[in-house]
């Protein structure tokens, strides 16, 4: 009985070669390249950004010391060779380590404000920040009639302290108790509280 010939093995698409300095020029070029690398590597997103485009833009902006909100303003600006090396290094680290981008740059943004994070805390991704603005601002539909009348707030499991800091802005006269079991996490929270000079309130 004749043997069946084996079907040829399917070839996997070749991995994309890493870009070199000088091949990419504008911020948009680097974002497009990063998105391709992230999708190829099947990275997960949910730690501060929800998709590869947002993650790529975040890393590019951080490498250039730009607030993410200003990306469109500089999208077509060209980068220097030194800046290109920094951006490419971050992109490759994100792919190689698979660590959340926030840990690579030690920063996360909530409600437009920057906060320090590292691996001692979970990357903040709570919707409470949005709720503070939409349901506790004192406007029509607010759950609290007068935010200025709130005297104390408890932030349980504060982690990086970012929600405690955001809460202090929503309730300007309140003392915030930021409670956390992890001593390491409290050190991160204390750093963020100090960055916003809120030691007397939190």
Residue spans of the language-model regions?
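SAM-dependent Rossmann-like transferase core, predominantly class I methyltransferases
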Residues: 75, 85-172, 176-194
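N-terminal auxiliary segments of SAM/dcSAM-dependent transferases
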Residues: 2, 6-110
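Conserved SAM-binding strand-loop segment of SAM-dependent methyltransferases
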Residues: 197-202
């Amino acid at each position: 009985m004749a043997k069946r010939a084996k079907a040829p093995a399917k070839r996997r698409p070749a991995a994309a070669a890493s870009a070199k300095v000088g091949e990419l020029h504008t911020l948009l070029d680097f974002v497009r390249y990063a998105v391709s690398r992230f999708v190829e590597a099947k990275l997960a997103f949910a730690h501060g950004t929800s998709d590869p485009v947002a993650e790529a833009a975040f890393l590019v902006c951080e490498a250039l010391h730009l607030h993410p909100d200003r990306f469109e303003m500089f999208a077509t600006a060209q980068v220097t060779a030194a800046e290109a090396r920094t951006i490419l290094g971050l992109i490759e680290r994100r792919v190689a380590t698979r660590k959340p981008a926030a840990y690579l740059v030690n920063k996360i943004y909530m409600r437009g404000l920057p906060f320090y994070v590292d691996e001692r805390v979970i990357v903040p991704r709570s919707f409470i920040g949005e709720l503070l603005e939409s349901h506790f601002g004192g406007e029509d539909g607010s759950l609290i009639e007068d935010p200025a009348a709130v005297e104390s707030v408890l932030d349980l499991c504060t982690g990086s302290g970012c929600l405690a800091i955001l809460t202090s802005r929503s309730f300007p006269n309140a003392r915030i108790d930021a409670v956390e079991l992890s001593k390491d996490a409290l050190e991160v929270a204390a750093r963020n509280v100090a960055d916003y000079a809120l030691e007397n309130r939190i």
